[in-house]
Amino acid sequence: MAEGETESPGPKKCGPYISSVTSQSVNLMIRGVVLFFIGVFLALVLNLLQIQRNVTLFPPDVIASIFSSAWWVPPCCGTASAVIGLLYPCIDRHLGEPHKFKREWSSVMRCVAVFVGINHASAKVDFDNNIQLSLTLAALSIGLWWTFDRSRSGFGLGVGIAFLATLVTQLLVYNGVYQYTSPDFLYVRSWLPCIFFAGGITMGNIGRQLAMYECKVIAEKSHQE
């Protein structure tokens, strides 16, 4: 037989590097989609909590006009959640400081519960003034970071997210893109940065946990190959 016939024309297998890159791209898309829907869900849940205070971001006549309604707020929150959740583990890898504090799903679920509780407190508890509300929510938000994160990168990103998100929100309100239903605008501004900070920490923890699961899957596949 000829030498060319000794080689079986079986299916070619991709090398471990190509397989790893493909897996990372697919897992990145999956993580982004999961984070997006989590952000949309939390936006709707937190909006229902704020309705109790009549401070919802959604005007009551949603179907009246596309421009006067805030139907796009949940998708925007979902997109921001996806970006934040993907950014946290990326920053950890870039800084060479992998986040190893309380890396289990039970801790992540408790973090989400505390975040929802902080929002519920801002909507349910009556404070004497806006300064007291701001200080209380700031303490709760920092406590959330200390309990479930404790990383310098997480704190820095949380502060940056709170600043940028609050700035964008106020610009949209001042330009009339949407409006708060509460007449007390100072009340809204007193809790908004703290909620954004806590939300950034929460989505960062979810993103880190999803990224850790991805690393386990890729490690198992490379070990099998």
Swiss-Prot record:
Superkingdom of this protein's organism: Eukaryota
Per UniProt, location of the Glycyl cysteine thioester (Cys-Gly) (interchain with G-Cter in ubiquitin) cross-link in this chain: 215
Keyword Transmembrane helix among UniProt keywords: yes
Membrane-crossing segments per the record: 29-51, 71-88, 104-126, 130-148, 154-175, 190-207
Residue list for modification Cysteine sulfenic acid (-SOH): 215
Modification Phosphoserine, positions: 151
Any single biological process term in GO: cellular response to insulin stimulus
Membrane-protein topology: Multi-pass membrane protein
GO MF term list: oxysterol binding
The record's account of how the chain is modified after translation: Phosphorylation at Ser-151 by PCK1 reduces binding to oxysterol, disrupting the interaction between INSIG2 and SCAP, thereby promoting nuclear translocation of SREBP proteins (SREBF1/SREBP1 or SREBF2/SREBP2) and subsequent transcription of downstream lipogenesis-related genes. Polyubiquitinated by AMFR/gp78 at Cys-215 in some tissues such as adipose tissues, undifferentiated myoblasts and liver, leading to its degradation. In differentiated myotubes, Cys-215 oxidation prevents ubiquitination at the same site, resulting in protein stabilization.
Subunit structure, as described in the record: Interacts with SCAP; interaction is direct and only takes place in the presence of sterols; it prevents interaction between SCAP and the coat protein complex II (COPII). Associates with the SCAP-SREBP complex (composed of SCAP and SREBF1/SREBP1 or SREBF2/SREBP2); association is mediated via its interaction with SCAP and only takes place in the presence of sterols. Interacts with RNF139. Interacts with RNF145.
Written domain comment of the UniProt record: Binds oxysterols in a pocket within their transmembrane domains and interacts with SCAP via transmembrane domains 3 and 4.
Function: Oxysterol-binding protein that mediates feedback control of cholesterol synthesis by controlling both endoplasmic reticulum to Golgi transport of SCAP and degradation of HMGCR. Acts as a negative regulator of cholesterol biosynthesis by mediating the retention of the SCAP-SREBP complex in the endoplasmic reticulum, thereby blocking the processing of sterol regulatory element-binding proteins (SREBPs) SREBF1/SREBP1 and SREBF2/SREBP2.
Name of protein: Insulin-induced gene 2 protein
Lineage of producing organism: Eukaryota, Metazoa, Chordata, Craniata, Vertebrata
